[in-house]
Amino acid sequence: MRLVILGGSGSGKSTQAQRLCSHLEITQISTGEILREAISHLSELGRHAQPYMIKGELVPDEMIIELIRLRLKKSDVIDGWVLEGYPRTAFQAEELDFLLDELGQKLDWAIYLQVPEAVMVSRSLGRSLPDDQPEIVQRRVEIFYDRTVPILEYYDRRRRLLTINGDQSPELVLQSILKLLLVT
């Protein structure tokens, strides 16, 4: 199964991606981790992406798409994957579809974790990631509403969107996702 997890900062994407991967025995792909790894290894893409991450801005599409392309070519994703943190724009969603077609893969579902803005901010500020400072968190929430919401329309038009109430316990969120995956 090939899934993407969508939602704002602090919506529970990482938590649910981990749980789904464990339950479905597939690979988790996190763009946040890929970017942090690229920066820590001082790769060329990492050096170019770092200034955007420091400001809480979206890393340019061409950089992210190239990182995702490299990741989806690795052998550990053959049985399926959950992609967390990508796509973040409608353009990226379309590019992901093109990339998957090129790689002979197909996205099964886009899972949207719907969470109120106040909850996203509160959860994000409660984490210990270096880029979870108040002004950066607020900027990421603004970007989510400005640029990410059109993705929901993109996947909904293609009948691949599952919307989940993310403002409940992680266990209940996982149960809701699995119930919809088994029914659809």
UniProtKB/Swiss-Prot annotation:
ATP binds at residues 10-15, 127, 168. Its EC number is 2.7.4.3. Disulfide bonds: none annotated. InterPro entries: Adenylat/UMP-CMP_kin, P-loop_NTPase. One of its GO terms (biological process) is AMP salvage. AMP binds at residues 31, 36, 57-59, 85-88, 92, 140. Coiled coil: none annotated. Residues 30-59 are annotated as: NMP. Residues 126-132 are annotated as: LID. It is an enzyme of class 2 (transferase). GO terms for molecular function: adenylate kinase activity; ATP binding. Monomer. Belongs to the adenylate kinase family. This is Adenylate kinase 2. The lineage of its organism: Bacteria, Bacillati, Cyanobacteriota, Cyanophyceae, Nostocales.
